[in-house]
Amino acid sequence: MAHDAGAFQLEVGVFPIQRMTFASETRYQSGSLSIDRAALLAAIAEPRVIADLEIYLAHPGESCRLVHVLDTVAPMAKVQGRSTVYPGFFGTTMPAGDGRNHLLGGAAVIVCATFPDPTSGALSPVEATIDMSGPAAPYCACSDTVNVVLVCHPAPGVSNADFDAALHRAKLKAAVYLARATAALTPPTVETYELSPVDPDLPRVVYVDQLHQQGLMAQTFLYGKHTQGLEPTLLHPNEMLDGALVNGNYRAPARAATYGHTHNFMVQELYRRHGQDVNFLGVVVGRGWQDSQVLKERQGWMMARMARLLGAQVAVMSADVGGTGGNNTIDFMQTIKACEQMGIQTVAVMQESGNPDGSDPTVVDFVPEANALISVGGIGWHTPAAPPVQRVIGGATVQPSIAEEPRDASGPLEVECWYGAIWKRAELGLSAVDA
């Protein structure tokens, strides 16, 4: 009998990681991962584009700071099934979301780099920093994971576009290489994800995810292709868990991350409640940052139309970068408006744009239909100053904002927003009072 490529039953074998060390072979044993640094370098090297690639380890609680952070990735590999993890970047592009993955729980691959050519305007990378300990650590994504850090330096004459493409390949290959150390092992725990039939009287819920897409350095990839021109698309939640979405957005420290897509807390919570108090129907993704008001309204109606055709009664929404960059917010609000007008009750999780004291408008755009908004605070909220650190990975200097001069990366540091702070706060469940 032919394999059913559309089964969408995904098993995830989780191997917990408490410690990583460099050794003569790559091997997992009892929560510890030994890494052959030379073998890992050989697996991901692209000397024509990346002239120098350094690999470091960073553990929670260390007096360590990571600078020039571009993205974070979950180490996982497909050990059974015909598709691949992170489909589209290598391997087949047949639908992901089934088979068995092995995941290194509590670990991440982090890529740090600066681009070779000068940039300006909106399509520019913005400094992102992670402190592994101290007062800022709770508000830094991946400060609580054991991290393999790739520090990449471009070869002479390489363009920003070619360097960026190589960084994507390097981080994803590293993630797969590390997880494959467990391929022949039996996982301590196995999590199974499938949208099994449930009580038809439960509320029918769809998750609507607005992706960020502007151009190079501010984009999201779906099955290996950027989402410029993407029409609203239906995904099985397992496709997200399998790495169908990959981050290429470096515009803000609060940016989305590939790790956040594969560990999407909205998807995980809806799965947890599937069959208990909700009937989780699936995920609708669409592109934010449409080019005109007409296209923003069109996008909203197309997203709502797809949710309605699924039979959704409720939509739960979120957006990359929190959804409140001025342009993105309009797209976000138009989707809420369209869903509500199509009879779909809509709850949206988003960041605020105002100051903590309430002196600025909370959001830059608003529609009356948006009557169930959940705030995870704003960009400049909950950004405690950090003391000096003993070790820095990624560079000798840091530039907290474009208005400031570079400074010693190991010294005391104040930033507008730590890496991944918005989705970290949402993950922590901070309330408006807390934030």
Which positions does each model-derived feature cover?
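Long, compositionally biased intrinsically disordered regions
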Residues: 342, 348, 369-435
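A general structural motif
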Residues: 291-307
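Long, compositionally biased, glycine/small-hydrophobic-enriched stretches that function as flexible linkers
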Residues: 1-227, 416, 427-435
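Small-residue-enriched flexible segments
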Residues: 193-290, 403-434
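Charged helix-capping and loop-helix junction motifs
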Residues: 330-335
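Hydrophobic beta-strand scaffold residues
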Residues: 280, 346-347
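Glycine-rich, charge-decorated loop segments at or immediately adjacent to ligand/cofactor-binding or catalytic sites
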Residues: 349-371
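Proline-aspartate-enriched helix->loop->beta-strand connector
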Residues: 311-316
